């Protein structure tokens, strides 16, 4: 059977050997050039291919159309990937009529993504394994063909576990490759609700945070021990590496990072103590702990730190454009609750953020993004994370001011995105549930649902299309220029400070604010086209917690992801929303200050929004990506959100001229 192989590392070598032993004909092998900054302790796929007389290639981008065409000319019946480090495009996967299969170093669906060998040790797992699975467009998500479990011993380190996984992989392939060849395999779909995903690790990720428990730090040492770069710490400005360690249940009142003793070299942790068994200074030699202590000049009571003493101990700088808006002001509140963020904000007003103006870690400038371009560029360069939250996002404006929607939502934001590319800054961009348009899927999925909009003569879609286009531009910058990004799509977030009643008076507000204004003024609640359109309403606190976790980006799991943030359990029609709001209004303690309820009135969308409007019947999110990347679930019931939103707006009304 003819195959094309994508391979690297020891797993790549053993995978090739297993294919040849099983009688496969390998037409070509694709691999990588070695990274000079990486310690090459593993076998060379290129050398093995040359020794076996198999054509071998190492293109920078195997997914380029020219390479896709060359692979197509090889007419592979089946494709295999063994630790190839780049995603293989769907066009290549579809070339093999018998399918494509990947060897992954974990028990899928657990530990999808990068560096599973290291992550299982970091997380203190007692079991892992190897999985052969069918390749699909999404990484590590295809049906499982075979798995073998591997026990992780307490004394395993990265290299010993690597050898165990290689041994298991040989066994797995010996058992499974003949079955694939003869078309005799049983595939089991992965359970998405059990999936976890982890990002790539870099040497800088392995610093020892002494406030953590000793067991956690010991697991870090195990996970990156030689030949990996090693866990590290500092004495003053001098860096040293810890190659091996032991956990001591030492009860000490010493501050975390303090040296308890030098022989053995024992360091106080957040819980217990860590013995440094072996280590080395800088580019020196490996030595046992007490000698390392002597070399570093450590004595009892000395303090270690996770970064150089001279390093700037600064907070993560977050730039929020549109900081006075609904999301911006709530996000600012959440960030300032922590002690490691500095927030820089720009907006044309400050009423919603007045409570932060005297906060020492909040810096605000009043201005317009279309005018303050120099200020914005300077702060993009200065900050670590950029959130451009400025947009026109009220439906009536889509038909009333379509060109202004395009200019602000696309053109102004594109300039900010290009600043992020220029200065290599992380951007977290607010897409919208509107991009799904008239999609007919039961659940709108970030990776699979089609984005369907109406004809050009319906200007209502200019917001959706502007947002979709900028999503695609960001994605392209990520693919081609290495832009670090996350796109998030809010689904009908509600809560205090959503719009204001003055905006509702001119029709430029979200649905619930407009309904509250009707109740406050004693005017009929207008149900556009009967109010049967269904939406999934999400409490702002749930939404902000998800957004905060995107900013935190644990394990880089959010990089390059599109994440719906909504509550599929809080689905209701606009009519049902109005009824729930009315019930809450009638029992509110301030109810007697307001006029009698004037009833519901059905109106046509064209008379309310103007010519060129189309509505969407339903909009329910899949939150699979949010669960996978953020470990997040929405928790707050819709009635609680309605009650709190109504209460907030009623208490903003001047009651001095109202009858008591």
Curated annotation (Swiss-Prot):
Q: What keywords sit in the KW lines?
A: Antibiotic resistance, Lipid A biosynthesis, Lipid biosynthesis, Lipid metabolism, Lipopolysaccharide biosynthesis, Multifunctional enzyme, NAD, Oxidoreductase, Transferase
Name the Gene Ontology molecular function terms of this record.
carboxy-lyase activity; UDP-4-amino-4-deoxy-L-arabinose formyltransferase activity; UDP-glucuronate dehydrogenase activity
Q: Does the keyword Lipid biosynthesis apply?
A: yes
Q: What is its EC number?
A: 2.1.2.13, 1.1.1.305
Annotated region Formyltransferase ArnAFT: the residues are 1-304
Key word Transmembrane present in the record?
A: no
| GO term, biological process aspect, one | lipid A biosynthetic process
Catalyzed reactions per annotation: UDP-alpha-D-glucuronate + NAD(+) = UDP-beta-L-threo-pentopyranos-4-ulose + CO2 + NADH; UDP-4-amino-4-deoxy-beta-L-arabinose + (6R)-10-formyltetrahydrofolate = UDP-4-deoxy-4-formamido-beta-L-arabinose + (6S)-5,6,7,8-tetrahydrofolate + H(+)
Q: In which pathway does it act?
A: Nucleotide-sugar biosynthesis; UDP-4-deoxy-4-formamido-beta-L-arabinose biosynthesis; UDP-4-deoxy-4-formamido-beta-L-arabinose from UDP-alpha-D-glucuronate: step 1/3; Nucleotide-sugar biosynthesis; UDP-4-deoxy-4-formamido-beta-L-arabinose biosynthesis; UDP-4-deoxy-4-formamido-beta-L-arabinose from UDP-alpha-D-glucuronate: step 3/3; Bacterial outer membrane biogenesis; lipopolysaccharide biosynthesis
**Where on this chain does UDP-alpha-D-glucuronate bind?**
393, 398, 432-433, 460, 492, 526-535, 613
Q: Where is this site: Transition state stabilizer?
A: 102
Query: Could you say which residues are annotated as the site Raises pKa of active site His?
Result: 140
Q: Which Pfam families match?
A: Epimerase, Formyl_trans_C, Formyl_trans_N
User: Which positions bind NAD(+)?
Assistant: 347, 368-369
Domain of life, per lineage: Bacteria
The subunit field of the Swiss-Prot or TrEMBL record says:
Homohexamer, formed by a dimer of trimers.
Which family does the entry's similarity section mention?
In the N-terminal section; belongs to the Fmt family. UDP-L-Ara4N formyltransferase subfamily.
Protein name in UniProt: Bifunctional polymyxin resistance protein ArnA
Lineage of the species this protein comes from: Bacteria, Pseudomonadati, Pseudomonadota, Gammaproteobacteria, Enterobacterales
């Amino acid at each position: 059977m003819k195959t094309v192989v994508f391979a690297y590392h020891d797993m790549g070598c053993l995978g090739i050997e297993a294919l040849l032993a099983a009688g496969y004909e390998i037409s070509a092998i694709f691999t990588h050039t070695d990274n000079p900054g990486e310690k090459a302790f593993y076998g060379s796929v290129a050398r093995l291919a040359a020794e076996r007389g198999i054509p071998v290639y190492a293109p920078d981008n195997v997914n380029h159309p020219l390479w896709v065409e060359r692979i197509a000319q090889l007419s592979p019946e089946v494709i295999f990937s063994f630790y190839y480090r780049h995603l293989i495009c769907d066009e290549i996967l579809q070339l093999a009529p018998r399918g494509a299969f990947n060897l992954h170093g974990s028990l899928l669906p657990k530990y999808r993504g990068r560096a599973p060998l290291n992550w299982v040790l970091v997380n203190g797992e007692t079991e892992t394994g190897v999985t052969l699975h069918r390749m699909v467009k999404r990484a590590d998500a295809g049906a499982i063909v075979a798995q073998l479990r591997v026990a992780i011993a307490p004394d395993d380190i990265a290299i010993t576990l690597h050898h165990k996984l290689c041994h298991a992989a040989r066994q797995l392939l010996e058992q499974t490759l003949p079955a694939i060849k003869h078309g005799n395999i049983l595939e089991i779909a992965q359970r998405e609700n059990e999936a976890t995903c982890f990002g790539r690790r870099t040497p800088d990720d392995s610093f020892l945070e002494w406030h953590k428990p000793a067991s956690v730090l010991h697991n870090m040492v195990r996970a990156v021990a030689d030949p990996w770069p090693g866990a590290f710490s500092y004495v003053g400005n001098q860096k040293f590496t810890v190659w091996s360690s032991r956990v001591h249940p030492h009860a000490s009142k010493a501050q975390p990072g303090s040296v308890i003793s030098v022989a053995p070299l024992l360091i106080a942790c957040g819980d217990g103590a860590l013995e440094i068994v072996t280590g080395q200074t800088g580019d020196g030699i490996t030595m046992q702990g007490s000698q390392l202590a002597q070399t570093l000049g450590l004595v009892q009571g000395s303090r270690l730190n996770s970064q150089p003493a001279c390093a700037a101990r600064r907070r993560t700088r977050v730039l929020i454009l549109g900081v006075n808006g609904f999301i911006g002001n709530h996000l600012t509140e959440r960030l300032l609750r922590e002690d490691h963020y500095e927030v820089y904000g720009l907006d044309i007003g400050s009423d919603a953020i007045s409570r932060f103006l005297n906060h020492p870690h909040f810096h605000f400038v009043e201005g317009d993004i279309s005018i303050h371009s120099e200020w914005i560029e300077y702060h993009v360069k200065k900050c670590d994370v950029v959130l451009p939250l400025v947009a026109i996002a009220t439906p009536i404006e889509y038909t009333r001011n379509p060109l202004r929607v395009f200019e602000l939502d696309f053109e102004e934001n594109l300039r900010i995105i290009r600043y992020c590319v220029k200065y290599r800054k992380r951007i977290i961009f607010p897409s919208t549930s509107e991009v799904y348009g008239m999609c007919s899927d039961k659940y709108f999925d970030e990776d699979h649902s089609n984005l369907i909009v109406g004809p050009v003569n319906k200007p209502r879609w200019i917001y959706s299309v502007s947002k979709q286009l900028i999503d695609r531009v960001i994605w392209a910058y990520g693919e081609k220029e290495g832009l670090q990004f996350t796109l998030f799509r809010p689904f009908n977030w509600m809560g205090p400070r959503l719009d204001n009643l003055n905006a509702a008076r001119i029709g430029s507000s979200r649905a619930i604010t407009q309904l509250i204004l009707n109740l406050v003024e004693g005017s009929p609640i207008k149900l556009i086209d009967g109010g049967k359109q269904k939406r999934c309403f999400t409490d702002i606190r749930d939404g902000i917690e998800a957004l905060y976790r995107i900013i935190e980006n644990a394990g880089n799991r959010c990089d390059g992801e599109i994440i719906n943030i909504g509550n599929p359990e809080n689905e209701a029609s606009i009519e049902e929303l109005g009824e729930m709001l009315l019930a809450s209004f009638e029992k509110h303690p301030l109810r007697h200050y307001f006029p009698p309820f004037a009833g519901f009135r059905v109106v046509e969308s064209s008379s309310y929004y103007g010519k060129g409007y189309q509505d969407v019947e339903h909009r329910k999110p899949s939150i699979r990506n949010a669960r996978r990347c953020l470990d997040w679930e929405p928790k707050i019931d819709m009635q609680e959100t309605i009650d709190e939103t109504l209460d907030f707006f009623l208490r903003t009304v001047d009651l001095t001229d109202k009858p008591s």
